[in-house]
Amino acid sequence: MVIQMKFFNREKEIHEILSILEGEPNIIYFIYGPLNSGKTALIKHIIENKLSDDYKVFYINFRTYLISEKREFIEAIFTTKKDDFFEKIKDKSEVLNLITKGAKILTGIPIPEVEFDKLFEEKINDAFQYLNSILLEVKKSGKQPVLILDELQMIKDVVLNWQKYLLKELFQFLVSLTKEQHLCHVFCLSSDSLFIEYVYSAGELEGRAKYLLVDDFDKETALKFMDFLAKEILNKKLSDEDKELIYNYVGGKPVYIYSVIDEMRYRKLEDILNLMLKEETQKLKYFLKELDYIKPKVELKDEIIEIKKDDIINALKLFKENYEVSDDDIPEPVYIYLVKKNILFLNPIEGILKPQSFLIWNAIKKLLNGH
């Protein structure tokens, strides 16, 4: 029997997102958080289990695409297939049938093949206008359209003709859907905190966007999650000591807690946790050792800035005593590099930096103990 990870809790976030969906669309929502904190799991749980058939969801996941040009973006958001059997969409009437009577959740914007081929030759706004017409038809049928763009940062650097950035054009379109037409709810998900910082700081969406943090579980929720998983997977209760030990090693990251308890079916808890920490410490050690031979650089406002190993060490040393520090405490180029390397997570709305996980935090403390 394959034991799958179950969705747990998130009542606060579920209530907030459902309340948004019950209202009129007027703002773009960015859902962000550390790696593997459960952003996609949360939004999928809501659209699959909490929404009535009065909603039509278009879920586009850029995670599986390498997008470097307009063509690849169009291929990612549109589909010419009717269903899982790869039957092609022939005409507009079949599109209307799919968006008004078909499944509640579509993983692409349906388009007849002949129309799809034309999009490659036309301006990006023509693709957006087609999408707009589809959403209007959904609304006309009595359903509320919802557009979800997962891992949106994948298109950040795509440049169109005349040196226009695709992301800028997309944002203008999303503002039209929400603030101007009040046509469609829009949620953009990202695990790239530098991308969220870019969107938040750029000012293009000032007053047009809000940001929802999906963080790792707090301690109370993490311990309840352990109880839930222990009953589901191990068919037994964990001692308070075991739960404290798990939390001290991996914190509230759902995927790590699940992994630990799943492995407890056939391995000792101490062995599982020690190996996880050892692997994370080794990764960090090799990362720091590499800095003896390379000169990392980051781009900041069109300037290329070189990062020194000592600056990296000094930044990480701040976490020996604290899990969170202000982003003012670490030079911007240094934290940009550490965030890019998935060692730190930046919350730009709060101005806070912290390790991407408790595991990384423990590795930092273990490795820099003598510094």
UniProtKB/Swiss-Prot annotation:
Keyword set, alphabetical order: ATP-binding, Nucleotide-binding
Name of this chain's protein: Uncharacterized ATP-binding protein MJ0147
Gene3D superfamilies: P-loop containing nucleotide triphosphate hydrolases, Winged helix-like DNA-binding domain superfamily/Winged helix DNA-binding domain
InterPro entries in the cross-refs: Archaeal_ATPase_domain, ATPase_dom, MJ1010-like_2nd, P-loop_NTPase, WH-like_DNA-bd_sf
Signal sequence, start to end: none
MF annotations from Gene Ontology: ATP binding
Family: Belongs to the archaeal ATPase family.
Binding site for ATP: 33-40
